[in-house]
Amino acid sequence: MKFFMNSEEFARRLCSWQREKGRQNLPWFTSDPYRRWLSEIMLQQTQVSVVRDYFARFLQAFPTVDDLAEASEEDVMRLWAGLGYYSRARNLHKAAKEIASAGRFPQTRAAWEKLPGVGSSTAAALASFCNGEVAAVCDGNVKRVLARIFALSAPINQSKTAKLLQQRAEALVSRTDPGCYNQAMMDLGAMLCTRTTPKCEQCPVGEFCKASRQGNPLDYPVKAPAKPRKTALVHALLCVEIKEEEPWVWLVLRDEVQKGMGHWKGLWTLPETAHPRGVEVARIEHVMSHVTLTLAVHRAEVSELPPKAFAVPASRLTGGPLPAPIKKLLSTLLFDAQLF
């Protein structure tokens, strides 16, 4: 079939489209490996529209990789708070220290992949963007594009199919401009070959696409049923004191993985208890990638708190390293004068 025989034409059309109509105004479109690496980590599982502001704040706080390496974990987590998938921030900090110690950024895909938090697809992106290495990105957008081009009937969330997609991606990637090609594939998935409303009539490689020719692009990609998400119920303690006419909230620094809340390691959270005694004042549900967390919040006295608890004035909560659902919860509860 044509899409097997003419990969050069496929890549040429993609890159031509990307240069003319792709996303050109993103702040990390530069040869600076620090910006590229920072953006690729932030873009894992997160949309461009969300990443923009966080990216700008990180660059303002940590203009270079050395600045990031020298920062405290608390400062890194504080700036990351709200972006989610918090292990990314911890790995980012660890990787910054490794890069700073080495005195340079990785020069190959294999070297990129050795950094904490850098998987195969991210390493391919960075190697192609920063080093010009012929390496194919195969992230979620690219997998969807390839599944439609080849009309793959096998579920893409199975390991065998993932390997096949990676092989197809490596076969198609441009040998002359792999960075442009990878960006084009990601842009195509984000802008035209979207999950629910593919714009096949605008696609620069539509004639190569089997699903488009069949007239059924929405039938692809095929996915096997996902495993049910685990659930966890956590009882948290809310203790508020009034000092100098300002409420102070007692918090703890999460320093361990517990009850499926590993994503919050390194952040400020409410103290927890296995045996709540106070009145329940709030209950929230928060869906994470691996677990649906129900947080039951109980009023408590200082004497009930763990030894490592500390009090923070309400005015510091906005800029503190709190998970987004905890920050939102506290902003609501602290305005309820009937609680205190």
Where are these regions (language model features)?
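Catalytic cores of DNA base-excision repair glycosylases
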Residues: 4-8, 16-201, 205-214, 218
